[in-house]
Amino acid sequence: MTQGAQRLVSMRALLESGAHFGHQTKRWNPKMRPYIFTARNGIHIIDLQKTITGLTEAYQFIVETVAAGNKVLFVGTKKQAQETIAEEATRADQLYVIQRWLGGTLTNFVTIRKRLRYLINLEEQRARGEFNKLTKAEALKRDAEIEKLNKIFGGIKTMDRLPGALFIVDPHKEDLAVKEANKVGIPIVAMVDTNCDPDLIDYVIPCNDDAIRSIRLIAAKIADAAIEGRNRRESLQADVAYSQSHDHAMAERMIAEEAEAVE
């Protein structure tokens, strides 16, 4: 377990964020029973000890995933999640989807990648000033196309291969993303409320997936994990580069010494 994971989140922070409030008892998924502490006034109360355990395991997994050179795709298209998901994914230099999930994003990635490259190509043309050669109407049309494509693909524009993991806010709402990830074998970390099916999720973080403060708290921790993983990878790469440089210098000295001995 990483040092960061050992002091990841306090019970107080979870309570203050409202992470313990589930849905109405009549809207529950019975598979969430192990994660529920009790019910009050017709609302299920989530066991926050299970939340801490789930978040800690998810944190460690994300660290290892990013340290291995993979990206994490943050998914949160519900209104109260969009801003936070975009901010935290960007802070951690990861990918995100905050508009409607486009079918085939994972299962038909070859086609999606063509659209991403098309968008990047358009932006490069604009940056080179090539739009200045067009008529005003045509240039405006291209600008509008870039804006439209960025709204759809902006958060995954740099995705040149499938992500190593998905972090999902509300897998019940993001059912298509869940299905695609399961189909292609990409592990899922998710904020799982009492109306969700935890069996579809690899790393369950049982918590309120509707409250803005709860979403902000958990998403920030996942972003922190991605940053820790990236830092670990960069540190390892630096160590390898130093070792290779040191070995090369030593080999050159040995060759030089042998040459002197022969002379």
From Swiss-Prot:
- Could you identify this protein by its name? Small ribosomal subunit protein uS2
Give the GO terms filed under biological process for this record: translation
Domain of life (superkingdom): Bacteria
NCBIfam families from the entry? rpsB_bact
The family annotation for this protein states: Belongs to the universal ribosomal protein uS2 family.
Give one GO term, molecular function aspect.
structural constituent of ribosome
- The gene for this chain is rpsB
Checking InterPro entries in the record gives: Ribosomal_uS2, Ribosomal_uS2_bac/mit/plastid, Ribosomal_uS2_CS, Ribosomal_uS2_flav_dom_sf
Q: Which UniProt keywords apply?
A: Ribonucleoprotein, Ribosomal protein
Q: Which residues form the signal peptide?
A: none
Q: Does the keyword Acyltransferase apply?
A: no
Which Pfam family is one of those matched by this entry?
Answer: Ribosomal_S2
